[in-house]
């Protein structure tokens, strides 16, 4: 409609409209990851959405796992032989590896990206869940309605940009309500465990200053935190509240049921494909980050607040 109206008004330089399907015919999309995604429940739902959207567009889907930059030349060879036209990247949080993949000069979109304290220039598109505002909003609710006066973050907040934004959302809520930040309330260990090891995690919690609420980097870490608190005989939510993130299927079945923040995984998958299709059909020099709206899911671990 816009192009027709422009033509009627005499704007002869307005670009000719086209059907994206014309430019997508016989194109091949590579789903590139550094881990086996089918082992991660959150990614299974996003993958299904990606597969459905690509099928709707009659685009071929290829998969490749790049576990280390040592095998990058193998990846290049595979891309050339397979005649890949665009790349979707998931679980890519290594800055050097990202640079190598971007150097392929193909249309590329990442789901989430690396955290960096040097403010890197993202010369690629990113699609991710809305982290900061979602966590901030939930924390403000717990402050105003749940009488929470201290917060701690559980998870390696530098693991990826999403985790860092969730950490910032907690900090931002505290700042807005004049709640002092105490780093002793956090469990910010690296990724070498301890979040999958109950003994190590419970030992770290025992040494920490217990806040009114733990904000966890994701639902898996939150469920492990609930178990660690049980080992320490610390009641949830009576003594401490716990928040996760993702709204994984298992979050409904923890004891107590886990309060979390829902991510629309179907929309996330669709937007990843949409962003890549736009890069393939409408090349642009400008890179962008697209956020998918998230919302809180109160359950028992925050006293249904």
Question: Positions of the model-derived regions?
Answer:
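N-terminal helix-turn-helix/winged-helix DNA-binding helices
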Residues: 1-39
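Alpha-helical recognition/docking segments in bacterial nutrient-uptake
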Residues: 23-140, 205-206
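Short, solvent-exposed amphipathic alpha-helices that sit
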Residues: 41-56, 134-137, 161-181, 224, ...
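Short beta-strand elements in bilobed, periplasmic/extracellular small-molecule ligand-binding domains
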Residues: 54-66, 153, 171-197
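Hydrophobic alpha-helical segments within soluble ligand-binding/sensing domains
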Residues: 125-153, 168, 172, 194-202, ...
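An alpha-beta-alpha
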Residues: 136-178, 288-302
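Short acidic capping loops at alpha-helix termini that bridge into adjacent secondary structure
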Residues: 149-150, 181-185, 236-241
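Flexible loop/turn connectors
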Residues: 198-305
